[in-house]
Amino acid sequence: QGSGRIKLNDGRLVRLGYAGQNGHDYKSIGPYFKEYNATGINSALDMIEWLHRNPQDSRKIIERNQSYVFFRTINGDGPIGAQGISLIPERSIAIDKAIYPYGTPIWIDTSLPKTRNYIERKYRRLFIAQDTGGAIKGAIRGDIFFGHGKRGEELACYMNNKGKQYALFPKSVKIPNYYRTH
């Protein structure tokens, strides 16, 4: 997660934005939960909760991923995407910047996942490519910014549904060869 909000012990809310990465490739910690006989790990939210319930083992698992992200405090409503502007819940999407330029409109046709509190349902809408991330590689991967709060966290943690995406280019733009062959 490249940015977000944290609540300090004194109750203040601080916004954080991406400031850099240590250069190591991202490695999912998901497979390591089996070594600790963790059951029922089906989403990122399940992983987070297990790590909180098992502090004696959490550091050992987290350190398996040598990729670290550094943050800075930011002003405004945040979070700020890689494009340099505030992300809009359920309208901003993170993409592979080597394939899609920031600002590209992308139509998404997928479904929202079944979660603890929501049923699976169709989800179709227009997004704008405004962010990127270390795990987003290729034309068929995108991460929707669902916003803050319990709903946003739950949807983001469970979302792994397949779907279709359509990059929308004006007629006047010469479409790169990559898009013609994929």
Please name every model-derived segment:
Residues Q1-H182:
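Solvent-exposed, well-ordered loop and adjacent helix/strand elements within mature globular domains
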